[in-house]
Amino acid sequence: MRYDKELTENEMIRQKILQQLLEWIECNLEHPISIEDIAQKSGYSRRNIQLLFRNFMHVPLGEYIRKRRLCRAAILVRLTAKSMLDIALSLHFDSQQSFSREFKKLFGCSPREYRHRDYWDLANIFPSFLIRQQQKTECRLINFPETPIFGNSFKYDIEVSNKSPDEEVKLRRHHLARCMKNFKTDIYFVSTFEPSTKSVDLLTVETFAGTVCEYADMPKEWTTTRGLYDPTHVIWTQA
C-alpha cells in the first residue's frame, strides 16, 4: 500500500514536470529548442526525458515539437499575410523547401494551397497536450437560418499568438455588457476576420453585436449566413 502511494506521488511529480515542459515548449515554438535545453530544464538526462515524454504522451518528443510548430505555421498561414519564407524561418525550419515538404506531409497540401482554400480543414491539427485549468464547454451545432440582426459593429487588430487574448476578451465583454444593459432579449455577436493591412503579424477582427429586433438607435443591419453554428460561441443570451 505504501509502495502504491509512493508510486502515485512519483507519477504526479513526473506529470507536473511534463506540464511545465509543455508550457515552456508552447512559449518557445518560435525560438530554438534542443533536447539539451529540455533535459537541463527538466533535470533528467537526454535519454530519460525522452523516455518519460514518450511513456506519458505516447509520442516522441522531437515529433511533438515538430508537429506543434507545423500547427503554429498553419495558423499563421491562414490568419496572417506573412510570407511562407518568414513563417518557415520564424519557426526554425532549415529552408522554405523543407518547411513546405513537412507541411505537406501533415496537411496534405502545400502552405500556399492551404492559405487560398475557401475552407479551413482542421482534421490534421495537432493540439497541445497542455492541461488547462478551465471549465469544459459542451460543443453542439445548430442549424441557424439566414437572419437580419440590427446593431453596431466594432473592429480591432490582434496579434496571432499563443498568449491569452486578455485585451480582446475585455473589449468584447465591454460591448456585451452595454448590449445587455440596453436590451432584454437575445444578443448576437457575429465575427469575421482577415489578415490586417497594418502589419503582416496582425489579424483584423470585425464583430457585429445586435439583436433580431430593430431599435431606433441601432441603425446598422447584418444578415447572418445560413448554416451550422456553435451557439455557445455565437449567441449570448440575456439572463
From Swiss-Prot:
Asked if the Swiss-Prot or TrEMBL record annotates the protein with the keyword Nucleus, the reply is: no
Q: Does the keyword tRNA processing apply?
A: no
What GO MF terms are annotated?
Answer: bacterial-type RNA polymerase holo enzyme binding; DNA-binding transcription factor activity; sequence-specific DNA binding
Q: Which residues form the HTH araC/xylS-type domain?
A: 19-117
One GO biological-process annotation of the entry reads: regulation of DNA-templated transcription
UniProt keyword list: DNA-binding, Transcription, Transcription regulation
Q: What protein does this entry describe?
A: Putative HTH-type transcriptional regulator YkgA
Mind listing where the DNA-binding region sits, in residue ranges?
Answer: 36-57, 84-107
Q: Which InterPro entries match?
A: Homeodomain-like_sf, HTH_AraC, MarA-like, Reg_factor_effector_dom_sf, Tscrpt_reg_AraC-type_HTH
Q: Which SUPFAM superfamilies match?
A: Homeodomain-like, Probable bacterial effector-binding domain
- Which cellular component, as a GO term, is one annotated location? cytosol
PROSITE patterns xref list: HTH_ARAC_FAMILY_2
